[in-house]
């Protein structure tokens, strides 16, 4: 299903003219042009690099050009056509293995002769003449190369160019005769390959023995990783080798890897959260869908020129099944949409999740998630919404050396949000542990508690207790949380500037075993009330009386269950935020 969807995406891009035909890589980083004359002599080394913005800076980066399809290299010698590194195009490098460099050059020369022999093109003849006359030993000291030799050997890719006698010049990759020759060679490259019915297209075709590499996944090998691979006999069946174990045609392997590499290279289609790299795309290949989706659940709208209010309005409309105009495009809620989560695993890629649904249903799931998360926020918290990463960070000790949340948690949380399913129990466990350890109920933690219990346990009682802001629920654990906040306030008012409050010593016991903590705290509050001015004493005494009146006649509960502790923590958070809001109004 994943490979079929990616292949269909490639074909949609091809139909729209946004990607090269099979046999060509659409975007490959090239740093220099080796410009040749009619006799194959090197005329110039042209720097193709350009300035590109990177954050707040501008850096020099290689130019992305369409080039002939790249071979997948392991440890052997394998040449690429027209575009490669110095080892293959010049026969020299700084790796200290001159014999291997010469072998690379000879392999590259043989490939170009195989493809270009008999081609009636001045550029093709110049390239062949270059390979026939070039002396690899002279490369490091060549007058046109010596000055840039260090840069050329710093993982730079070079491409052939041609200059005619009249001064006109062009890259060999744009020469029609050379392109036709390469296309013919590529189309017949699988003639000797084993044939079988392709699992993706359903057609009999030559099977790809090794699939092209996937690049751009953070944490994977720089040379790329494989989504489909068989690198040990234990993974093979019925005597098959490599790709024959799961027959995918050369065309389909090229199509799906090209599509995935393009998605990974586009920041509007790709986002990394923890160790999971997420790519998403619409069936019609319109970029506005993936751009909007990443803003919906990863944030960053303002950086893309979209206000938070416009983004929220678009999400709400789509969740209700209404089309909206967004980023100069019209978003159809019925458009099929895909979300793929992958993570690195040595030389392979692991699929964390693959989801397919209508864009409107994804929007509805995200809107429901946002509604469940909605809670009174402190004045100092300027965030309109909480991203997936922000939620996962609430489970992490920010004072520890490793501040990254569990990769498993991030993946499970993403899946729950996008599918509308139950939140993972590890999310609640992580937040509960942090509250107990730090005795702090932050906005993020309170929002998680609220969302978790509303989604996983949608009882009428939970709907009554877990609200956006303070409510007058008589639920005992909720009232106890409010009461604890009032007791803390009384202590702070009676002892201005106090370094530690009852929260630091009693929060966990009050939350888990109220009967052991609250009698002591209420007695302590009576002493604090005596220190206050009359207006304050009357005000807080009234608050205490109103809250105590909502408790059962049997007294404080001996213990609270985990859901009841969640209600306690929400009550504490609501009451505390009401106090801060009133304080801000007075100021």
Annotate each language-model stretch with its function.
Residues 1-190, 235-587:
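Conserved phosphate-interacting/catalytic interface
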Residues 209-245:
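Short microdomains enriched in Cys/His and/or Lys/Arg
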Residues 190-196:
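Short metal-coordination and nucleic-acid-contact micro-motifs, chiefly zinc-binding Cys/His arrays
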């Amino acid at each position: 299903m994943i490979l079929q969807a990616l292949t269909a995406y490639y074909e949609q891009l091809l139909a729209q003219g946004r990607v090269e035909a099979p046999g060509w890589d659409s975007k490959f980083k090239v740093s220099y042009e080796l410009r040749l004359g009619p006799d194959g002599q090197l005329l110039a080394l042209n720097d193709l690099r350009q300035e590109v913005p990177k954050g707040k800076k501008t850096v020099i980066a290689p130019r992305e050009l369409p080039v002939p399809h790249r071979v997948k290299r392991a440890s052997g010698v394998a040449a690429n056509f027209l575009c490669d590194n110095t080892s293959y195009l010049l026969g020299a490098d700084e790796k200290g293995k001159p014999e291997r460099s010469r072998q690379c050059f000879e392999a590259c020369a043989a490939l170009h002769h195989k493809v270009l022999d008999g081609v009636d093109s001045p550029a093709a003849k110049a390239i062949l003449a270059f390979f026939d006359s070039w002396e690899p030993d002279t490369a490091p000291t060549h007058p046109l190369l010596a000055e840039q030799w260090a840069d050329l050997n710093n993982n730079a890719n070079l491409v052939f160019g041609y200059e005619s006698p009249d001064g006109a010049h062009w890259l060999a990759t744009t020469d029609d005769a050379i392109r036709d020759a390469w296309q013919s060679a590529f189309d017949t490259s699988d003639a000797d390959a084993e044939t079988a019915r392709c699992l993706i297209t359903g057609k009999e075709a030559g099977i790809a023995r090794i699939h092209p590499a996937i690049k751009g996944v953070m944490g994977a090998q720089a040379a790329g990783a494989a989504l489909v691979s068989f690198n040990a006999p234990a993974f093979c069946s019925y005597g098959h080798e490599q790709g024959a174990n799961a027959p995918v045609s050369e065309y389909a392997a090229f199509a799906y890897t090209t599509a995935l590499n393009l998605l990974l290279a586009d920041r509007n289609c790709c986002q990394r959260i923890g160790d999971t790299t997420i790519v998403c795309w619409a069936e019609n290949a319109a970029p506005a869908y993936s751009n909007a989706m990443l803003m919906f659940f990863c944030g960053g709208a303002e950086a893309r020129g979209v206000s938070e209010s416009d983004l929220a309005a678009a999400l709400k409309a789509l969740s209700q099944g209404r089309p909206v105009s967004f980023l100069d495009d019209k978003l159809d809620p019925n458009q099929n949409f895909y979300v793929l989560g992958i993570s690195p695993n040595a030389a392979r890629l692991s699929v964390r999740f693959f989801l397919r649904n209508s864009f409107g249903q994804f929007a509805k799931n995200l809107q429901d998630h946002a509604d469940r998360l909605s809670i009174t926020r402190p004045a100092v918290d300027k965030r309109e919404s909480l991203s997936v990463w922000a939620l996962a960070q609430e489970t992490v000790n920010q004072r520890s050396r490793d501040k990254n949340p569990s990769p498993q948690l991030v993946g499970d949380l993403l899946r729950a949000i996008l599918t509308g399913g139950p939140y993972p129990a590890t999310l609640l466990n992580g937040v509960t542990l942090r509250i107990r350890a730090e005795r702090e109920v932050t906005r993020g933690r309170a929002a998680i508690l609220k969302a978790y219990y509303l989604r996983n346990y949608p009882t009428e009682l939970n709907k009554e207790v877990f609200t956006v802001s303070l409510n007058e629920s008589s639920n005992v654990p909720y009232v106890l949380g409010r009461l604890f906040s009032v007791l803390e306030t009384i202590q702070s008012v009676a002892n201005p500037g106090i370094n530690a409050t009852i929260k630091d010593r009693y929060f966990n016991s009050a939350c888990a075993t109220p009967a052991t903590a609250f009698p002591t705290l209420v007695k302590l509050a009576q002493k604090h009330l005596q220190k206050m001015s009359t207006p304050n004493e009357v005000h807080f005494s009234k608050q205490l009386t109103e809250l105590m009146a909502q408790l059962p006649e049997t007294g404080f509960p001996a213990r609270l269950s985990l859901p009841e502790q969640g209600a306690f923590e929400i009550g504490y958070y609501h009451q505390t935020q009401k106090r801060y809001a009133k304080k801000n109004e007075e100021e």
